[in-house]
Amino acid sequence: MPREEVYGTGKQSIRYAAKVDLTRPAAEQPYLHNRWHPDIPFAGTIKNGETVKIECVDWTGGQIKNTDDADDVKNVDLTKVHYLTGPFEIETAEPGDVLVVDIQDVQPLEDHLWGFTGIFDKENGGGFLDEIYPKAAKAIWDFEGIYCSSRHIPGVRFAGLIHPGILGCAPSAEILATWNRREAELIESCSHMSRVVALPPLEQSAHAGSADATIKAKVAKEGARTVPGRPEHGGNCDIKNLSRGSKVYLPVHVKGAKFSVGDLHFSQGDGEISFCGAIEMPGVITINFKVMKDGMKQLGMKSPIYVPGPVEPQFGPGRYIYFEGFSVDEHGKQHYMDASVAYRQTSLRAIEYLRRYGYDDYQSYLLLGCAPIQGHVAGIVDIPNACTTLGLPIDIFDFDISVEKPAEKKDRGSCAFASDNPGAKA
């Protein structure tokens, strides 16, 4: 559809800077790309001070379906992700400036009122707890206005804190080279480890928008993968609080900024622990763009800054159950100030707690990735243990999970598993 389409009929009509087609493969759409590279052509131009709507596909490009098995999650092609909309030229933006991204609204597409949460198979993506829960699983969520619920995790309903997982401007050629060098060094230094520690450039499945064959080949060879966030530009930070009313301040490294956005989430818990842990969806985001000239120098900016908006689910400070975790792993081994070990233990304590009500562990793992849980680093100085906490909202359940109330265990159904692994239920 033409990018000139506008929304509304009054003086403040908002145009679409880009629209997507969910019936068409993501790799064939010129407004999308799945690598970071300064040479990817502009998908459109946005004026300094302009507000626009930008449509996005889900981060996998439509690979996950509304079904009751997790075959699609198990076999997802992760060489294709993330599909982002952009990059956009922001008029007057130059290296050294700061791009002010004012998120005015985020919504699902009207003809796609559902999303998904997944646990990747340990052999294809894995996740935060994949040594304990190695099998693929999935939950489908239906949207009802601001609320969501899932047939795969019954007894739960909550308002979404809808947000983009990825916001970023293109790296310069020098910054891209820095990324590739330092991540290659990490891969080499961790070659003895049994897990993937970083993803180097990969030519397979690279999509460079409307680039010609020469530029596409260069992007495929050099382009940075979109999986990690990086300090120089933000990117895939998966910060659940970047919802309506938020402002994000992004460093600009190339002329025109080359801003991209994607990986929209209906809801997410702090940490997005199952990797595909948010409620993933295609959707539309409304953004106002302003350029802060020479902003990087003014702010002494070395990484993005954000101010959260005033919109979030209101449970109240007394309506959470908090679980604690420390740098002692599930085997009893002591680690030194390891917040990742601590947060794994925090997550496991919450999963064990929900087991008492009849949820299987995979259902709870999925839920902790996408529900509006509060994750915090409580202590990071008391050697040898970091202490982390996870706050589970009591009111997302349609039954009482209060600590002092005896737990009533019931059949809570099942999430979706891969068809060749029906016995994955914990």
Q: What is each PLM-predicted segment?
A:
Residues 351-426:
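TerminUS-proximal long segments
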Residues 27-37, 77-85, 225-233:
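Short, structured beta-strand/loop micro-motifs enriched in basic residues and often containing a Trp
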Residues 196-337:
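Conserved mixed alpha/beta catalytic, RNA-binding, or beta-rich assembly cores of soluble enzyme
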Residues 2-76:
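N-terminal, Lys/Arg-enriched amphipathic/low-complexity engagement segments
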